[in-house]
């Protein structure tokens, strides 16, 4: 199956692909792109087609550094199937060339891909998944991994996220899986009749 060269996309074209992609989130959405634009960054949407269908895309922003050089950043990485070895390779090459043609000095990505499964205490789950191959593939493209740091860093997105698997679980089972302090906080909120209401943009 033939892959295209890297294409520049309109905001609408990118959003149509990104809005249904499993790795999509606010940080790589068109709304994030608009936020970067308001802060003076240049905003690009680029992608690759396979046999005429969009197969990979990314929000790519850049800002001027010293002289004519620019810093490029793909917030939360590329939207593609990282298990498809051909796609990450083609996307990396295309984006690197795109940045180079625009005096890019540095290109940063922080893919929205889970690296390894841990339990609620931060311990590695025995027989859990590990996506080291994705790290290896990106390093083979020329990226340098910055290590598995902990804590908060204003220059980087959070590395650790807590995710609760909701599949095939009733309310009580889910509740019991919470940390004891979290269960206490929920019960306290219920006693104080604190309620969450879902609201649209018009109520914000």
Regions found by a protein language model. Name each.
Residues 2-9, 56, 131-204:
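Acyltransferase donor/substrate-recognition loop-hinge adjacent to the catalytic core
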